[in-house]
């Protein structure tokens, strides 16, 4: 009985033997780096764009997120014949040398990098174009990258559908514990939305971190972006993926994106949260999943994206 079991395990493990290969493209001042994962015969290739702040190519960040969700997504896609490049954003991690100040960026800067990565990915895979798969804020970047010959289309995963400031306002209001700091938070949001920086030195420490003066110029730029309008300008295929247990980005965002791009394919995934993992419905388990790298990514997400990028016109 042991031999068949071993053979079965070997068969299941075989697709995971594909190894990451470090790749790079020119950046503004130094190289931009990423990890290329290529199956034996790639039917499509995607560029996976991470979310906000210091989030790395795998979906982790030093603020306590160790979900490894973007690496798991890449591995799952590889098993279905989809190659991927997971990127580190300019100024961060392996792309730290690309710019001197990681905070001196705009959404347009990130979008330009995404277009460059798409061209590189397509060439590496021997395909005419690459898909942009943006997670969370990465979806906004994918939207801003717009239309280009080497971009097949966009896959927007747990992506903002409302203006950035509106989403932050809703997130803060949703937590009753934030009630004592809401007035200051709203004052900061209003100032940034008006294109003005604000002194937060007298604010609660959590708000000082959220509205750190170093990132306020980036937030001002990000607040100007309207995801729905950007979606409406897209000419290629679009997929919207939204977990129904997401505590950060909600179905209201997915609906807004769908409103901008009625032709988009919408995948709503029950019981799946922001880091694309199944949770039991309790806030505790939802938040705990952010720091459990071994919890699998939702199969529905992998299957849906793989099916879409390999057959977008079905």
Q: Residue locations for each model-derived region?
A:
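N-terminal cap/lid segment of alpha/beta-hydrolase-fold proteins
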Residues: 18-45
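Short, surface-exposed "cap/lid" segments of acyl-processing enzymes
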Residues: 41, 46-77
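Conserved alpha/beta-hydrolase
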Residues: 68-96
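Alpha/beta-hydrolase active-site loop
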Residues: 69, 102-124
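Primarily recognizes the serine-hydrolase "nucleophile elbow" in alpha/beta-hydrolase
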Residues: 119-175
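Accessory cap/linker subdomain of secreted extracellular hydrolases
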Residues: 155-228
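Short beta-strand/loop motif that positions the catalytic acidic residue
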Residues: 234, 240-242
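Catalytic active-site module of serine/aspartate enzymes centered on a nucleophile-bearing elbow/loop
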Residues: 272-276, 281-314
């Amino acid at each position: 009985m042991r031999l068949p079991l071993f053979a079965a395990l070997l068969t299941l493990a075989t697709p995971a033997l594909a190894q990451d290969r470090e790749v790079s493209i020119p950046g503004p001042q130094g190289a931009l780096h990423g990890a290329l994962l290529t199956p034996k015969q790639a039917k499509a290739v995607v560029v996976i764009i991470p979310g906000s702040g210091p989030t790395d190519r795998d979906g982790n960040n030093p603020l306590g997120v160790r979900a490894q969700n973007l690496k798991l997504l890449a591995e799952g896609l590889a098993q279905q014949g989809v190659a991927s490049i997971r990127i580190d954003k300019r100024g961060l991690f392996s792309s730290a040398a690309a710019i001197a100040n990681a905070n001196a960026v705009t959404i347009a800067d990130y979008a330009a990098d995404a277009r460059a990565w798409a061209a590189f990915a397509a060439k590496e895979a021997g395909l005419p174009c690459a898909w942009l798969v943006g997670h969370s804020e990465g979806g906004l970047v994918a939207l801003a990258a717009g239309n280009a010959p080497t971009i097949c289309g966009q896959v927007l995963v747990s992506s903002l559908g409302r203006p950035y400031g509106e989403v932050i306002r809703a997130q803060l209001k949703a937590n009753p514990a934030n009630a004592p700091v809401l007035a200051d938070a709203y004052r900061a949001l209003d100032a940034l939305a008006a294109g003005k920086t604000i002194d937060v030195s007298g604010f609660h420490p959590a708000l000082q971190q959220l509205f750190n003066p170093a990132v306020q110029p980036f937030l001002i730029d990000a607040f100007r972006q309207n995801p729905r309008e950007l979606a409406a300008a897209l000419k290629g295929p679009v997929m919207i993926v939204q977990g129904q247990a997401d505590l950060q980005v909600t179905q209201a965002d997915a609906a807004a994106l769908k409103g901008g791009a009625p032709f988009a394919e919408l995948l709503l995934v029950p019981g799946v949260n922001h880091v694309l993992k199944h949770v039991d419905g309790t806030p505790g388990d939802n938040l705990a999943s952010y720091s459990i790298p071994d919890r699998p990514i939702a199969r529905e997400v992998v299957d849906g994206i793989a099916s879409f990028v390999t057959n977008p016109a079905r």
